Amino acid sequence: MRQFDRHQGLVAPMDRANVDTDLIIPKQFLKSIKRTGFGPNLFDELRYLDEGYPGQDVAKRPLNPDFVLNQPRYQGASVLLARRNFGCGSSREHAPWALEDFGFRVIIAPSFADIFFNNAFKNGLLLITFDEATVDRLFQEAEAEEGYRLDVDLEKQQVTTPSGEVLTFEVDPFRKHCLLEGLDDIGLTLKDADAIEDFEARHRQARPWLFRQAG
């Protein structure tokens, strides 16, 4: 998992509440268990005018010109500004995979679905919650100012706007530690590899009958 310390990125405002995981990455693209390759089909039903299917050449598909991520001013966006209850629906881990693969590092919204919230942090995304009034103001600024960028400092837990306004956000200390160190569940386990091996050796010595092969 990539480390997250500080990120400055272009903001894409997605003005839609209750965006569910099926809208983030439709079910027909869930056959793969790899973490990469989902970016081209992120928000597939909103980005394209035709129906998508696995293996399709997305370069030949007609784009929806009204969708925010297809508009030239938001190309290269890495901060997604969203509305309440983002990530609701089924608990597919492919949703944060698709967002990360597309290039997003930060998502800001008034609220997130619990399971999506947990999955996103475990896959290197920083999710930030602000109250509705603050999010409304960020939407207004991002839509009014082309090239609107936010500076996100995880260590200080601050978001700085182009005008210099500093917004402070809360983050669970353990999740913050994992992002700063780039540790997912596997990485956390491997940090204790020596202790695990030591336990296994002592366990085998103390209870050898558990390890005898039948025959």
From Swiss-Prot:
EC numbers for this chain: 4.2.1.33
Sorted UniProt keywords: Amino-acid biosynthesis, Branched-chain amino acid biosynthesis, Leucine biosynthesis, Lyase
GO CC, any one term: 3-isopropylmalate dehydratase complex
Catalytic activity: (2R,3S)-3-isopropylmalate = (2S)-2-isopropylmalate
GO molecular function: 3-isopropylmalate dehydratase activity
Gene Ontology biological process terms, A to Z: L-leucine biosynthetic process
Keyword Lyase: yes
Enzyme kind, highest EC tier: lyase
InterPro entries (alphabetical): 3-IsopropMal_deHydase_ssu, Aconitase/3IPM_dehydase_swvl, AconitaseA/IPMdHydase_ssu_swvl, IPMI_Swivel, LeuD
Pathway: Amino-acid biosynthesis; L-leucine biosynthesis; L-leucine from 3-methyl-2-oxobutanoate: step 2/4
Subunit text: Heterodimer of LeuC and LeuD.
HAMAP family hit by this protein: LeuD_type1
Reported function: Catalyzes the isomerization between 2-isopropylmalate and 3-isopropylmalate, via the formation of 2-isopropylmaleate.
PANTHER family the record matches: 3-ISOPROPYLMALATE DEHYDRATASE SMALL SUBUNIT (PTHR43345:SF5), 3-ISOPROPYLMALATE DEHYDRATASE SMALL SUBUNIT 2-RELATED-RELATED (PTHR43345)
Family per similarity comment: Belongs to the LeuD family. LeuD type 1 subfamily.
Protein's recorded name: 3-isopropylmalate dehydratase small subunit
The encoding gene: leuD
